[in-house]
Every structure is written in C-alpha cells, then in structure tokens.
C-alpha cells in the first residue's frame, strides 16, 4: 500500500512539473529576455527526471523485477528517456533545440501512460515465463532508449524540412514578384526598384544567414541524436536475438515486432548513409528520418495493437510489450 501510494504521488508530481516546464518554454519563446525562466525550465526537467526515476525504482522494489514488462512501464521508461536526453546537454553546457521537443514528448508519453486506458496495467502481475530472464533489462531498456533518441532526432529533421520548405517557397515568391514588377515599369523606375531590391537583399541575406545557421544546427543535432539512437537500437536488437534463442530456440522468427524493428533499423541505416554522403543534400537525409518517425511509432505501439506474434502477451488489452 505504501509503495502504491508513493508511486501515485511521484507520477502526479512528475506530470505536473513537466507541464509547468512546457508553460515556461512557451513563455521564453515569446520573451527571450527572461533568462531566469529558461534556467527554471531546465531545473524543472531535472526534478521531473528524479521523480520518474523514483517512480521506476519504487515499482522495481514493489514488483520485484525491472519495470519494463508491459506497455505502461515501457511508456514511463520512455518518458524517463526523454528527460535524460533533455538534461544531458544542459549539464554539458551545450545549446541545442532538443528542449523544445523532449518536454512535450515526455508529457505526451507519461500522460498516455497514466490515462484511464492503461489503468489495469498499473497493478502488479506475475511475469510470464518468457519475460523471466536477465535479458529483460538489457534488451527492453536499449530498445526504449533507442526509440526515444530516434524520435527526438526525427522530429528535429521534420523541423528542418519545414523551415527549408518555407524558405524555398518564400524565395520563389519573391523572385516571381521581382520579375513581374521589373517588366511592368519603364527603365528609370526599374533602376529605382533595383536599388530598393539591393537594400532588401542585404537585409534578407542577414536573415537568410541566421536561418542557414539554424538549419545547420538542426541537422547537426539530428545526426548526433539519431546516431546515438541507432546504436541503442542495434544493441537492443542483438540482445533480443540472443534472448530469443534462449527462450524460443531461434535467433530470429520474423514476427511483426521483429519485422518492424528490422524495418526501423534499415530506415535509419539509410539515413546515416545519406547523411554522410557529401553528394546528397541535407533535405534528402531529413526526409528519410521523417519517414523513420512514423515507422518507430508503428514498431513501438502500432504492432502491439494487433495482439499477434511472439512479442504479444495479451491482445487489445494493452498488456503487450516490446
């Protein structure tokens, strides 16, 4: 009873704190001068990290096994992973744009985990024989950490594509506007218009420079985070293969979860290849990463809804896991 009450308290505290953090982020987006608020949001995510850590440890002690045996626990661990990705650059004093993604991602996953849909899974249950293994912690934790990093990196790539697309549309519209005006006036008016265009161009060049710098930063952090997530995903798949051989007598069975995990791994392997290829534009790799965002959710959550395969321990009751 004590552990259950403590878990309930930590769950609501972490959810409330991360909600406040998102509010602070929205305020700092509107008012850049308030430096103290930005620092408060970072400290809020640190508090969220410790609350979720306490929640996981409490559930670990209460249940007697590592809390990654069902969808509820894996979502809490996913929220914990988002908070880690958020605070690590903060301690390293690196400025990045992950904070705009990790805080909403954390509140989304934790909000869904604590919703009424998964209420039955909050109670303790005896592990099925297939999950009673020392590989549970290694395999599932690596997979969830990989999902978290890949989701963050993919969202950065989506943001990169949106900014690049808007920039291309704006440049195209300005060029068409300039051409139309150029051929509709006489020569003197054209020269005056040309001088104005040069002045506007100097202003736009500065703005385009900062936009290009921002796009470069998005690409840089997307590549770093996806590379880390790809490493975690690879370790998770390999450890899962070893576990599968011990449990089922085969390293690979091509059930839905394994198939989509392989598809996810392939998509991000293609991303890393296109990203390191200097002959290809940045947008090409960003498109691949954006596709990977949808693939991850299919692999992590969508396949569980099918209720089939070796990785399904319960059908549409949300009692399945990775």
UniProtKB/Swiss-Prot annotation:
Annotated GO biological process: cytochrome complex assembly
Entry keyword annotation includes Transmembrane helix: yes
Segments passing through the bilayer: 17-37, 44-64, 71-91, 98-118, 143-163, 225-245, 258-273, 286-306
GO MF term set: heme binding
Classification via InterPro entries: Cyt_c_assembly, Cyt_c_biogenesis_CcsA, Cyt_c_biogenesis_CcsA/CcmC
Keyword hit for Thylakoid: yes
GO CC field: chloroplast thylakoid membrane
Family: Belongs to the CcmF/CycK/Ccl1/NrfE/CcsA family.
Protein function: Required during biogenesis of c-type cytochromes (cytochrome c6 and cytochrome f) at the step of heme attachment.
UniProt xrefs under PANTHER family: CYTOCHROME B_B6 PROTEIN-RELATED, HEME EXPORTER PROTEIN C
Protein's name according to its UniProt entry: Cytochrome c biogenesis protein CcsA
Gene: ccsA
